[in-house]
């Protein structure tokens, strides 16, 4: 597939490496495993109310696929993957896709700007210093109870409550995040790899969505 679309591509973060340019510069890159995305459904305005391409990627054991999903994949004659993703596509371009077809990494080209979406690393329950970069209290000089305490949570009897959104201790990480305007450094369709300049959200092994940059 040589045409360029605004739809995304689901890959898996493999880790980070570096690539040397012809002039000897070291470029840090994130390697994305870009196995072909299989088209499981074409959604149209007439039937679904909007136009989109639904894809799956990877493989999942039959024992782990529930009956509705198994029926969905069987109807499309597509091998069950590890999930389903949808990408909006203009109605005029739906004819370029077919159920059972594949979308490969060659929808991207070297030098193209992309946005990468993933789930950040989960850190569990964390205090305000790690979670929000609060300043620590004095280590000495009479301070014995509030080295890592967040400090005041509000005022007094008026307003008599803690305002919503107050930065406090709590769950950190494991949220969906996008990094924008990253450059594609290399695309290797045969090996199924995309090299992207810089870091992308999430841990190695996590699913990421690569799509053309919205603000390029």
From Swiss-Prot:
InterPro entries: Ribosomal_uL3, Ribosomal_uL3_bac/org-type, Ribosomal_uL3_CS, Transl_B-barrel_sf. Gene3D superfamilies: 3.30.160.810, Translation factors (2.40.30.10). The modification N5-methylglutamine is found at residue 157. GO terms for cellular component: cytosolic large ribosomal subunit. Methylated by PrmB. The keyword rRNA-binding applies. GO terms for biological process: translation. The keyword Ribosomal protein applies. Disulfide bonds: none annotated. Pfam families: Ribosomal_L3. Keywords: Methylation, Ribonucleoprotein, Ribosomal protein, RNA-binding, rRNA-binding. GO terms for molecular function: rRNA binding; structural constituent of ribosome. Signal peptide: none annotated. Part of the 50S ribosomal subunit. Forms a cluster with proteins L14 and L19. One of the primary rRNA binding proteins, it binds directly near the 3'-end of the 23S rRNA, where it nucleates assembly of the 50S subunit. Belongs to the universal ribosomal protein uL3 family. This is Large ribosomal subunit protein uL3. The gene is rplC.
């Amino acid at each position: 597939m040589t045409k360029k679309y605004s739809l995304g591509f689901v890959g898996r973060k493999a880790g980070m490496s570096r690539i040397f340019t012809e002039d000897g510069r070291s470029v840090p890159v994130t390697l994305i495993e870009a196995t072909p995305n299989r088209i499981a459904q074409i959604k149209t305005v007439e039937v679904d109310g909007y136009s989109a391409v639904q894809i799956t990627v990877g493989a999942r054991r039959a024992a782990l696929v529930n009956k509705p999903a198994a029926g969905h994949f069987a109807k499309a004659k597509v091998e069950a993957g590890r999930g389903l993703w949808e990408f909006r596509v203009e109605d005029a371009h739906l004819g370029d896709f077919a159920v059972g077809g594949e979308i490969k990494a060659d929808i991207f080209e070297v030098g193209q700007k992309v946005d990468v979406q993933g789930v950040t690393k989960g850190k569990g329950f964390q205090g305000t210093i790690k979670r929000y970069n609060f300043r620590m209290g004095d280590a000495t000089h009479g301070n014995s109870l509030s080295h890592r305490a967040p400090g005041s949570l509000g005022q007094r009897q008026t307003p008599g409550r803690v305002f919503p959104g107050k930065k406090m201790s709590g769950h950190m990480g494991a949220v969906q995040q996008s990094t924008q305007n990253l450059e594609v450094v290399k695309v290797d369709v045969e090996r199924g790899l995309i090299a992207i300049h810089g870091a992308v959200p999430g841990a190695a092994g996590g699913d990421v969505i690569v799509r053309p940059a919205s603000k390029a």
